[in-house]
A protein has these predicted regions:
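Alpha-helical solenoid repeat scaffolds of the TPR/TPR-like class and their adjacent stem/linker regions
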Residues: 1-211
C-alpha cells in the first residue's frame, strides 16, 4: 500500500503478487490488486479479483445470507439485487440497473431508504425497490447479486462503460423548480449546485477535496 500511495504502481502490483504467492488464501492482496487493476482500466482482471472483497477482514460475514446462487448472467430469471458499501457506491453502481433489468423476468432491488424515491423516479416501474430486508422473501427470487458485482457480469470492459447512457438519474422537477426560485430570480444565470457528504474515516478521504 505504501508503494501505491507513492504512485509506484508497478512495484505495488509486484508486491501484491509476491504476497499472493506466499499466502494464496489471504484476501487482502487480491483485493488491493483488484483496485489497482480497475484504476488503470484493466477490467478483465480487476473485476474478478474484486470479488475477493468478501473475504477481507472488514467484510467477512457481511454478505447476504441466502441459499440461492449468485446471478452470473442467466436470462429471464427472478433476481434479487442488494446494496453494499455506502450510499455513494449504491448511486454509482445503480447506473447498471437498467442493463440488469433487461436480463430479468423480475427484479427486486434492496437499497438505502433515502434512495428509493430517486430510484423509483429514474428506473423502470417494473422494478420492486425495497429497503427492508425482511420484506424480501427468499422464495421470491432465483438468483442474487450484490450491486458492486454487476460490472463483472454486465460491464467487463471499458467499452461497455463508454457505450452506456451517460445520464441515468432523474430529479424531482417540482423540487428542482422550487429550489431555483429560492436561489435566484435571475433566469439568465446558470445555476450549478454541488452537495455531497462522505465518510471522513476512509484513509483516502483527503484526496476527494475539490478546493
Amino acid at each position: 500500500l505504501s508503494r501505491e500511495q507513492l504512485g509506484q504502481y508497478t512495484e505495488a502490483l509486484a508486491d501484491y503478487d509476491n504476497a499472493i504467492s506466499i499466502k494464496p488464501d489471504y484476501a487482502e492482496p487480491y483485493f488491493n490488486k483488484s483496485l489497482q487493476m480497475l484504476l488503470h482500466g484493466n477490467f478483465a482482471e480487476g473485476w474478478p479479483l474484486y470479488e475477493w472483497r468478501w473475504k477481507t477482514e472488514q467484510n467477512i460475514g457481511k454478505g447476504l445470507k441466502t441459499s440461492k446462487p449468485l446471478w452470473q448472467g442467466e436470462k429471464n430469471a427472478n433476481v434479487f439485487l442488494w446494496a453494499e458499501q455506502g450510499i455513494g457506491d449504491e448511486i454509482m453502481f445503480a447506473s447498471i440497473i437498467p442493463e440488469l433489468e433487461e436480463q430479468c423476468s423480475n427484479l427486486t432491488v434492496k437499497c438505502d431508504k433515502r434512495l428509493i424515491p430517486l430510484f423509483e423516479r429514474s428506473f423502470s416501474k417494473k422494478i420492486n425497490f425495497q429497503f427492508d430486508q425482511s420484506k424480501v422473501s427468499e422464495d421470491s427470487y432465483e438468483f442474487h447479486i450484490p450491486i458492486a458485482s454487476l460490472p463483472s457480469v454486465l460491464r467487463p470492459s471499458l467499452d461497455n462503460f463508454k457505450q452506456a447512457p451517460r445520464s441515468y438519474l432523474r430529479c424531482d422537477n417540482k423540487k428542482a423548480e422550487k429550489l431555483k426560485q429560492i436561489i435566484s430570480t435571475d433566469k439568465t444565470q446558470t445555476l450549478i449546485g454541488i452537495s455531497w457528504n462522505s465518510s471522513a474515516k476512509q484513509p483516502c478521504a483527503h484526496h476527494r477535496n475539490i478546493d
